[in-house]
């Protein structure tokens, strides 16, 4: 799985899904909400999405957008570094379940990009046991934040090494 950092706008990208992590009690950026047809704000207003850690809501067919799906990922009440790690892993697993080839994860500038890259890499791990597995559908994760590509590479490499160790232990 390829993990990259992109500092531009998500609309510039050709991705199957966009993951938007949100803290409990927060609202979606007004411009982003308007661009997504007001659907994220509606999910929050109706209480269908609360922002609770581990929460995930899926929006299908965003109007006038190349993005097919938008995932709202809950960060909990006071997001810390570990929450960005968990949100990235959850976004990758949700994208895989929806059979998306690529997913962009919207991160604020103060988020830890390396932990998000590690979380995305950990999110693709599946215990293999002795059975043959279907190919992993997610090929690309794009972290929408500022930073150098070496940060994402370090997180990806760490996740690959840990996942390899997990596989060796399972044998």
Language model segments and positions:
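Short amphipathic alpha-helical segment within the helicase RecA-like ATPase core
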Residues: 1-171
């Amino acid at each position: 799985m390829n993990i990259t950092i992109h500092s531009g706008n998500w609309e510039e990208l050709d991705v199957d899904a966009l993951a938007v992590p949100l803290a409990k009690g927060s609202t979606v950026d007004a411009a982003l909400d308007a661009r997504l047809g007001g659907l994220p704000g509606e999910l929050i207003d109706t209480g269908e999405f609360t922002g609770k850690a581990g929460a995930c809501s899926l929006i299908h067919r965003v109007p006038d957008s190349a993005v097919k799906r938008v995932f709202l990922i809950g960060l909990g009440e006071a997001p810390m570094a570990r929450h960005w790690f968990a949100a990235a892993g959850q976004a990758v697993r949700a994208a895989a379940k929806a059979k998306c080839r690529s997913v962009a994860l919207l991160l604020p500038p103060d988020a830890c990009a390396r932990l998000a890259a590690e979380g995305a890499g950990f999110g693709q791990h599946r215990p293999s046991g002795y059975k043959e597995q279907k190919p992993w559908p997610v090929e690309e994760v794009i972290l929408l934040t500022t930073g150098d590509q070496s940060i994402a590479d370090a997180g990806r490499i760490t996740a690959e090494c840990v996942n390899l160790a997990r596989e060796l232990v399972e044998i």
